[in-house]
Amino acid sequence: MAAAAVAGVAGLTSGAGRKRLLREEDMTKVEFETSEEVDVTPTFDTMGLREDLLRGIYAYGFEKPSAIQQRAIKQIIKGRDVIAQSQSGTGKTATFCVSVLQCLDIQVRETQALILAPTRELAGQIQKVLLALGDYMNVQCHACIGGTNVGEDIRKLDYGQHVVAGTPGRVFDMIRRRSLRTRAIKMLVLDEADEMLNKGFKEQIYDVYRYLPPATQVCLISATLPHEILEMTNKFMTDPIRILVKRDELTLEGIKQFFVAVEREEWKFDTLCDLYDTLTITQAVIFCNTKRKVDWLTEKMREANFTVSSMHGDMPQKERESIMKEFRSGASRVLISTDVWARGLDVPQVSLIINYDLPNNRELYIHRIGRSGRYGGKGVAINFVKNDDIRILRDIEQYYSTQIDEMPMNVADLI
């Protein structure tokens, strides 16, 4: 493994084309622990991409590839199996979207790439990025997700889709019904692989994988890749290229992390109300560990005359989509959510994350707070810590080699 230091990177957010520059001094501290044969391709022009794809990349607002894009895209295009780990907010989604689009034969109206994601929202966002980047290619791409009409899925798949992005359950269902034909699939991408391969999705991924042609290329992308996950990759990857960030560098440099000591659960609500008074928030996400807590807190905040919106996995798909749309557009400014929101959803203007509950596992911590300063933007994360949570907080600090200080009085100035 060779370690390559990373120079400053320009990254971009969603189709609105907001430019966010990762500060150079931050990026030099991130070390990629990478297979020796991986070289750096500094521009999109030198990646050997097709013209119509390049047009889409520049039209989308990208100028210079991010660190992960400079390393991974060329390897994926070459046909290598790739394990890519990159900080939250450094352009992971576009990394595999560009690679997938480059490898398609548009003339062949069959599914050639399959992208699996742990949540419906993430699968939907991947589809949007694919369609935007592939705008000049006439690419057909479908999001195959639970909570939507099965008949519509079947109709779209019968029409012919070059790429299918989806959640494992629905994708497997479509393969079993023979609506999603797998014979032309060349590439399988697992996004947020740590979450996907955890107990809940492991079986479903294996079910899907069994139906794919034996020579299918596999790419695994995630912000965290714990050791036990890497062991599992041996089962369905051949001589993979590794593009890894050292674990303790994964906390984003631009994010200031604080804790507020609350002795008991009941005190959290008052603390949150006090914070509302002192913080002029641009946009904020408040995380709770359970759907019930999200509903309870939302109701309590509204009773206290605070305007909030909320989202969790039990809500109907249509409702979740409209809540996300409102939040993305800035129409709603505070979102209370479970971890369904924490994975890979781009809302560039979020500058504050509050962990009303500390996450149940330490890997989720980075997914949550990595949201609040995407592409090196400034962000603040505030953790509400009960007496019996101190141990968990110290564990998170140690795991990410970071420091979480007590929240200062002037926290509003940092946002």
Curated annotation (Swiss-Prot):
One of its GO terms (molecular function) is RNA helicase activity. A motif (Q motif) lies at residues 42-70. It comes from the Eukaryota. SMART domains: DEXDc, HELICc. SUPFAM superfamilies: P-loop containing nucleoside triphosphate hydrolases. ATP binds at residues 64, 69, 86-94, 346, 371-375. This is Eukaryotic initiation factor 4A-III-A. The lineage of its organism: Eukaryota, Metazoa, Chordata, Craniata, Vertebrata. The gene is eif4a3-a.
